[in-house]
Amino acid sequence: MTDSDHEFAPAKISQKPVQRLRCLACMAANRYLHRRVGTFLARLTLAVWGAEVGTGLRVRGRLRVHNEGRLVLGSGVQMNSGPANFVGGERRMAFWIGGGGELAIGDGCGLSNTTIVCLRSITILPGTYVGGGCEIYDTDFHQLDPEDRLLGRGEVPVAPVRIGPKAFVGGFCIILKGVTIGEGAIIGAGSVVTKAVGPYEIWAGAPARFIRRLAPREAPAGVGGAGATT
């Protein structure tokens, strides 16, 4: 090894932590600016569409909003939209509320790249997290009868959706009309939920089915354990 090797080796080693610190600083600054700008634009968009928004809203990325009904966001709601969240990053947070529809998202909820279409009522209760790329619908979008569908006649089935409080919906789930998901329930990633889920139950699959109840060590005091039935 030459003297020059000895001279330059420490310099190369010392540069690594410096570069890492610079990288971390840039990432932190980018996240901060992304969140500040995203939140400002989100509040502006929501105000234009007549939404009722609580304090402490935090948004990364740009929202898509269409509101002909009522849109209510509680305090401390956090949302990621687009590439702000790697999971489901090819999508954006999107709200579509038809005339007469009411979408309410409670305090402290978190959602990422979720598509919500509401024609009657969708309620996401406080402390509920909805993973990246989920879809929540309270409508079938079309008539069931093929002739009615082709002719555009008849009623489109709709039914309210209610989720939480403190529920967790894994990424890329689909929640269909008429579904109720109870307090503290967990829905496995990629599930299609078509029926009611009880409090502190774990469901997964397409269509989703009951897996088990949360064990006593996993759930608050007083909640039944894994041996409980549905």
What residue ranges belong to the model's regions?
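Domain-scale signature associated with acetyltransferase and cell-envelope carbohydrate enzymes
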Residues: 1-137, 164-166, 183, 199, ...
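Beta-rich strand-turn-strand
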Residues: 113-124, 171-186, 191-194
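Histidine/lysine/aspartate-rich catalytic loop segments that bind and position anionic ligands
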Residues: 125-158
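Conserved catalytic-core motifs of eukaryotic protein kinase domains, centered on the activation segment
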Residues: 140, 147-148, 179, 213-215
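Surface-exposed acidic, glycine/proline-enriched linker/cap segments
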Residues: 151-162, 166, 172, 225-229
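A short, glycine- and basic residue-enriched loop/turn
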Residues: 160-161, 178-179, 200
